[in-house]
């Protein structure tokens, strides 16, 4: 079986990225990911959500990109069942999962900047459906092992996604939180897109709270689309 048998990808994205899927680097990603999936190891997010970020936001609908690093590797208990926190969207978690510290800080800053009510759950899929691509640079992870799939090769694929979007859609609002995400600035054509940077929202990082990042995003969105982005959840 092929990757897309385990991890569905929408027709719009398959057409948009068609030439990538036969390249040696992608075939190697497919091989390594399927090997991990078939091993005794537990891989997050569940394979059906591997491309959830892409499936929720078609290429033609992308207006904002919020780039993450890799999926959450932890679990939570629901009805005595251990479930993955990761759901395939950067920074987002399953509806009933506890809200992680980074996401709590995102909600705090959003409230401080724009007065948006702090939601009771951490599912950001509503943002994705409104045109915010919540893409992780690395799309999978082994349970309880942060950055464990760094060597699978996902970053080559996510870089291609970004570069194709930068060519096709203009102007995009590209939000890069933290030093790892900000390395992607080199991929962004100058003077074509709006780049917004801030420290990573992790409590281990300093400077995110008070950065005004959501004010910057909203101002940029108004400039491009002449209306507000709806941040409500």
UniProtKB/Swiss-Prot annotation:
Its main location: cytoplasm. Its EC number is 3.2.2.27. It is found in: Cytoplasm. Belongs to the uracil-DNA glycosylase (UDG) superfamily. UNG family. Keywords: Cytoplasm, DNA damage, DNA repair, Hydrolase. GO terms for biological process: base-excision repair, AP site formation via deaminated base removal. Coiled coil: none annotated. This is Uracil-DNA glycosylase. One of its GO terms (molecular function) is uracil DNA N-glycosylase activity. The active site is at 70 (proton acceptor). One of its GO terms (cellular component) is cytoplasm. Pfam families: UDG. The keyword Cell division does not apply. Excises uracil residues from the DNA which can arise as a result of misincorporation of dUMP residues by DNA polymerase or due to deamination of cytosine. It is an enzyme of class 3 (hydrolase). It comes from Helicobacter pylori (strain HPAG1). The lineage of its organism: Bacteria, Pseudomonadati, Campylobacterota, Epsilonproteobacteria, Campylobacterales. It catalyses: Hydrolyzes single-stranded DNA or mismatched double-stranded DNA and polynucleotides, releasing free uracil.
């Amino acid at each position: 079986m092929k990757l897309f048998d385990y991890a569905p990808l929408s027709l719009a994205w398959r057409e948009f990225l068609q030439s990538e899927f036969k390249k040696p680097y992608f075939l190697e990603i497919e091989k390594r990911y399927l090997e991990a999936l078939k091993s005794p190891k537990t891989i997050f997010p569940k394979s059906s959500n591997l491309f959830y970020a892409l499936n929720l936001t078609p290429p033609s609908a992308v207006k904002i990109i919020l780039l993450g690093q890799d999926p959450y590797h932890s679990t939570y208990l629901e009805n005595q069942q251990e479930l993955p926190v990761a759901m395939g969207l950067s920074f987002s978690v399953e509806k009933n999962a506890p809200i992680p510290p980074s996401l709590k800080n995102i909600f705090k800053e959003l409230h401080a900047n724009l007065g948006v009510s702090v939601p009771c759950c951490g599912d950001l899929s509503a943002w994705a459906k409104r045109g915010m691509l919540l893409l992780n640079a690395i799309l999978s992870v082994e349970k309880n092992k942060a950055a464990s799939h760094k060597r699978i090769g996902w970053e080559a694929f996510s870089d291609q996604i970004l570069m194709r979007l930068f060519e096709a859609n203009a102007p995009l609002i590209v939000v890069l939180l933290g030093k790892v995400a900000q390395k992607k600035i080199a991929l962004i054509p100058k003077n074509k897109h709006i780049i917004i940077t801030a420290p990573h929202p992790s409590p281990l990082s300093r400077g995110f709270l008070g950065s005004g990042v959501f004010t910057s995003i909203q101002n940029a969105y108004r400039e491009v689309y002449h209306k507000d982005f709806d941040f409500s959840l």
